[in-house]
């Protein structure tokens, strides 16, 4: 799952897995790191909703993992909602949900526009751009900094730490980068509170310690930057390559909302995640799952499971792209709004935008967890800058 071959065509790999193994597949997440990949939809729902038998706490597992394992920064235990179980999970989850629920979605709509327009103006007169490095990433980064109340100087260090985590840099180095930057943010927000997630986490009755606060913010950025950037880019790829979205098929062209819903079903940006660790050997679908070995939900493969996939995506929210059960994403409304608005801003400004190469020439970044393009070159008629109000 970490190979370039898998990244190039994971759906072929999932089909072969299903043919050979059924709903549960033995895989390696990294060389010498075994796991079970869940590719059956109903099996995934069952496991995700059974935290007593399948907790998300990896501490026993990681004792057997070398410190230099490249996926350790992604999976190691942290005192946050994503990597905890039981009462710990409930405490962290309540604090995170309250902090996220405090986001003003109407104001967020305006915030996306305020970021998108200046970004578009940096390349609209060139007639060409890379939508990953020049639009999707900087927009996602700026919006998340705004939501977190994070100034640009601290945010730059956070972005570096996040990139290091997804690229498999040494766990101690990743944690040092994050720890320093996010401690600075927490110190700032204690002195200058605002209408932001960091301030709300600080004020929550859970009374989170500094290390806990840092790790809630690690989750915010980890679940935000890379997956949200990829959601935008992959949806744009669908809209730029499928004739339906270009209005070349009779009838009304599907909307950005339709494209997002379809993409979340067919090719979700966080393709394999929702990791749990069985407390004891557990028999599922005739397969014994070893105790404390990672069980990874393939949201991508499960969504495309022939048992449930009928090709109807309109107002269909049964996909697993946001996860399900007690660890389901609490910020899906925020992510959906940001992606929808960012895509609309770009296509409204540059309606004749198209890929600068054929889709099969695009390079997908290797990695067991994400579905991510390395670059997304586009061309368009040169356009004057947009007016910023």
What are these model-derived regions, one by one?
Residues 214-221, 225-250, 330-350:
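Cytochrome P450 catalytic-core helices
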Residues 148, 157-207, 211:
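Cytochrome P450 catalytic core segment centered on helix I
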Residues 1-132, 141-159, 163-165, 172:
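Active-site substrate-recognition loop segments, prototypically the cytochrome P450 B′-helix/B-C loop
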Residues 303-311:
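Cytochrome P450 core scaffold surrounding the K-helix E-X-X-R motif
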Residues 250-287:
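Conserved cytochrome P450 K-helix E-x-x-R motif and the immediately C-terminal K′/meander segment
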Residues 310-376, 384-389:
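Cytochrome P450 heme-thiolate "Cys pocket" and heme-binding signature region
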């Amino acid at each position: 799952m970490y190979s370039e071959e898998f990244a190039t065509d994971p759906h072929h790999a999932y089909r072969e897995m299903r043919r050979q193994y059924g709903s549960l597949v033995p895989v390696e997440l990294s060389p010498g790191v075994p796991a079970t990949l869940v590719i059956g939809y109903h099996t995934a729902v069952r496991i995700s909703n059974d935290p007593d038998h399948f907790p998300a706490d990896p501490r026993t597992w990681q004792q057997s993992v070398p410190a230099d394992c490249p996926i350790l920064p992604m999976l190691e235990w942290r005192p946050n909602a994503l990597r905890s179980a039981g009462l710990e999970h409930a405490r962290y989850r309540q604090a995170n949900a309250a902090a996220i629920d405090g986001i003003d979605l109407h104001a967020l709509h305006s915030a996306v526009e305020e970021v998108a327009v200046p970004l578009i103006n940096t390349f609209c007169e060139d007639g060409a751009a890379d939508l990953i490095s020049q639009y999707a990433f900087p927009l996602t980064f700026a919006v998340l900094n705004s939501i977190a109340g994070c100034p640009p100087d601290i945010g730059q260090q956070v972005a570096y730490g996040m990139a290091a985590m997804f690229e498999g840099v040494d766990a101690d180095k990743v944690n040092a980068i994050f720890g320093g930057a996010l401690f600075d943010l927490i110190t700032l927000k204690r002195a200058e509170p605002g209408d932001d997630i960091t301030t709300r986490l600080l004020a929550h009755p859970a009374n989170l310690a500094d290390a806990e606060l840092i790790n809630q913010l690690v989750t915010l950025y980890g679940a935000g930057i890379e997956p949200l950037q990829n959601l935008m880019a992959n949806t744009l790829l669908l809209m730029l390559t499928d004739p339906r979205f270009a209005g070349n098929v009779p009838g009304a062209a599907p909307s950005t909302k339709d494209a997002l819903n379809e993409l979340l079903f067919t090719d979700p940006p966080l393709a394999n995640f929702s990791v749990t660790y069985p407390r004891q050997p557990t028999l599922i679908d005739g397969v014994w799952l070893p105790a404390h070995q990672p069980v990874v939900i393939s949201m991508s493969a499960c969504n495309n499971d022939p048992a449930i996939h009928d090709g109807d995506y309109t107002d269909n929210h049964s996909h697993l792209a946001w996860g399900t059960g007690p660890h389901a994403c609490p910020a899906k409304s925020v992510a959906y709004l940001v992606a929808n608005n960012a895509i609309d801003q770009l296509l409204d400004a540059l309606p004749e935008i198209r890929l600068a190469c054929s889709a099969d020439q695009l390079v997908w970044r290797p990695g067991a967890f994400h579905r991510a393009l390395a670059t997304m070159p586009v061309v368009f008629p040169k356009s004057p800058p947009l007016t910023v109000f």
